[in-house]
Amino acid sequence: MSTAIDMDGSDKTILERLNQEYVDAFMNADVEWYRKHLAEDFVVIESDGSVLNKTEFLTNAAKGPDVVDYKLQNVDVRIYGNAALVQATGIWTGQDGSQGMSRYTDVYVQTVAGWKTVSAQITRTSHR
């Protein structure tokens, strides 16, 4: 049983939009978008297990994506007061034509400046 809270659905809509913008920023190497929307203490666990802080993540993001296409599926947003989980599946095509799938969980907190991503974890998988 979920204890998610979002009485009018507006936060869910905002988080769904932010999730899509996060992916768009990834595909376009939009470091400024990330700089604005990631918490200062942001941390990501990459699909290879490496852990990056915000500065390291921004450096990697500036290099551009290693994929040419990334489509979202199964986006699930759950809100718990001033925290939220966004989980989704991404179907991607690499620059070399390879294809794959990843699943991720992003953790957001609501601040006076709006929702900020504080954590992300990515898992590449062969399961669909």
Describe the role of every protein-language-model region.
Residues S2-K36, D41-R128:
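A beta-strand edge to alpha-helix "cap/lid" segment located at domain peripheries
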